[in-house]
A protein has these predicted regions:
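Position-specific recognition of the canonical hydrophobic site in helix A of tetratricopeptide repeat
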Residues: 17, 51, 78, 85, ...
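Residue-level recognition of tetratricopeptide repeat
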Residues: 14, 48, 82, 115, ...
Length: 270
């Protein structure tokens, strides 16, 4: 019986991987590499399978082997960049991305570069990269969310609000609604900030920081009873937030002076 060739194994392994059977895909790749060591397609696919299982270092080894055997593969450079970013090796990730973009400019590579610049703390370059994506795809939600967050960190609240409102659609993650709450809070739009923080908590009920900030904006809006309920939830989720809650209660324009720390803890349910 004829042994399956590498392309046949890749097709079967890819089908298994895409059907949610990564262990089968891994076994096929490993058997294929036992027959044809160094086959770049199999190393590439095995790297993708391992990466999906968060086996970062083995995945990195296989994708680098694939590139050594078949230089100039844009898809392999993109995968190598993602794996390097996951490993925290941002310089290597950016090097792979620049090579991928040179070989075959495509949206996924530019998006991955923006993520890498952002995660590595290169804020001016990250903001520029996210903005470039928005220039081409104005409704790109991730780009709008990250550009908005960076604009807020730079003190550009007007731009931050505009882009975060674009990103804050029904299925947006809790982090986007939280960031929108921060911007609206800084703009002293407490009603909209309240709505954003509530949405963040709807998405992620254990979001202690959102509960804390919800308490602060409710307090600023003069609704101290609702603020206390939010503070109780924040304290329940994260008892370490007690100091921030106490500070907020005594420093805001609508607050209460708590001289007895134990009494405040009891009021918060502690």
């Amino acid at each position: 019986m004829n042994q399956p060739n590498a392309e046949s194994i890749v097709r079967r392994a890819t089908a298994a991987f895409n059907s949610g059977r990564p262990d089968e895909a891994r076994e096929l790749c490993e058997k294929g590499l036992a027959r044809t060591p160094g086959e770049p397609m199999l190393h590439h696919l095995l790297a993708a399978v391992l990466f999906s299982k968060n086996e970062i270092q083995p995945a990195r080894k296989h994708v680098e082997t694939s590139l050594a055997r078949k230089p100039g593969n844009a898809a392999a450079h993109l995968l190598a960049a993602r794996i390097a970013r996951a490993a925290g090796d941002f310089d290597a990730a950016l090097l792979h991305l620049d090579r991928a973009i040179t070989i075959k400019p495509q949206r996924d590579a530019f998006l991955e570069k923006a993520r890498t610049l952002d995660q590595s703390g290169q804020r001016p370059l990250a903001r520029e990269a996210w903005r470039a994506i928005l220039d081409v795809v104005p409704q790109h939600r991730e780009a709008a969310a990250r550009f908005g967050r960076l604009a807020w960190e730079d003190g550009d609240h007007t731009a931050a609000a505009a882009y975060l409102e674009r990103a804050a659609v029904t299925d947006a993650p809790a982090s986007v609604w939280f960031d929108l709450g921060l911007v609206r809070q800084d703009l002293r739009d407490y009603d909209k900030a309240t709505a954003a923080y509530r949405k963040a908590l709807d998405k992620k009920p254990d979001y202690a920081e959102a509960a804390l900030n919800l308490g602060i904006v409710l307090q600023e809006a003069g609704d101290l009873d609702s603020a206390m309920r939010a503070y109780r939830e924040a304290y329940r989720l994260r008892p370490q937030a007690f100091g921030k809650i106490a500070m907020a209660l005594t420093s805001a324009s609508h607050g209460r002076l708590w001289i007895d720390e134990a009494a405040l803890r009891r009021s918060l349910g502690g």
